[in-house]
A protein has these predicted regions:
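Residue-level signal for transmembrane alpha-helical positions in Major Facilitator Superfamily
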Residues: 7-8, 56, 92, 138, ...
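Short extracytoplasmic
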Residues: 80-103
Length: 248
């Protein structure tokens, strides 16, 4: 905008100073054909630029409102994401969650191994479908992750605390079900042998919107995890001061 303003100012300045000083000081320049022409040109340019800037500002505002109000498939409001050192046991996770929930600002907390919304998924697993290998995004979570993030299970059941005692269980999104023709109770490769599909959840956007939907699997590792969560997703009460919650 600054460069545009400078360029627009250069020509009128050069054009006006090209006239004899006597003509300008006597006031005849304004009424002259050249004066009328340059005045009309400047008014026209100012009008066009002002209109263009207003349109651009409105477009940016509409785009911002669209992105803020777009249904991502999960409840993104009142969520704090905290990267932390990996826990060493489920008991440590439970103790940390209980401590958080002592504060009335905090409703619940879920945990996962990495960022939920990211353009680069850290883990992708492979599934054989129609004699072809197809990949899907793989995300290891705590048993209450879908509940805390507001992701609806549309078929089967959600994870439960008892799933931490099993050898791993899956919940896929609807996009994965469509792509791979998956079924409830179907068993796929897990980290510790075969793991069943216990449910399917509503589609959601785990990447920025320009990437579209992807086949996605939530996974509770069960009794013998190879790793523990490194990210906490903390749901706070509506109206909570985020700084106060983070300080806690």
């Amino acid at each position: 905008a600054l460069l545009l303003g400078v360029l627009i100012s250069l020509y009128p300045a050069y054009y006006i100073t090209s006239f004899p000083p006597a003509l300008v000081t006597k006031g005849d320049f304004q009424a002259s054909p050249s004066g009328v022409l340059i005045r009309n040109i400047l008014i026209g340019i100012q009008f066009v630029i002002s209109t263009a800037l207003i349109i651009v500002a409105l477009f940016i505002n509409l785009q911002h409102r669209y992105m803020m109000n777009y249904d991502m498939g999960f409840n993104k409001d009142e969520i704090l994401t905290v990267q932390m050192k990996s826990f060493q046991s489920y008991a440590a996770i439970d103790a940390f969650t209980a401590k958080l929930k002592q504060n009335p600002m905090i409703i619940d907390a879920a945990f996962a191994t990495g960022d939920f919304v990211t353009s680069e998924r850290p883990s992708n697993w492979v599934y054989e479908h129609d004699n072809k290998l197809a990949g899907y995004a793989f995300y290891s979570v705590s048993w209450n992750f879908l509940k805390v993030m507001g992701i609806d299970v549309v078929e089967g059941r959600d994870f439960t605390k008892d799933d931490e005692k099993r050898n791993g269980v899956y919940i896929f999104n609807e996009e994965a079900k469509r792509q791979f023709e998956l079924k409830l109770d179907q068993e796929l490769r897990g980290h510790n042998g075969q793991a069943p599909i216990i449910g399917f959840c509503k589609d959601f956007h785990s990447k920025p919107l320009q990437y579209g939907l992807e086949a996605f699997a939530f996974y509770v590792m069960g009794a013998h995890p190879w790793d523990y969560p490194s990210h906490a997703y903390i749901r706070v009460a509506a109206g909570t001061n985020y700084r106060d919650a983070m300080d806690y």
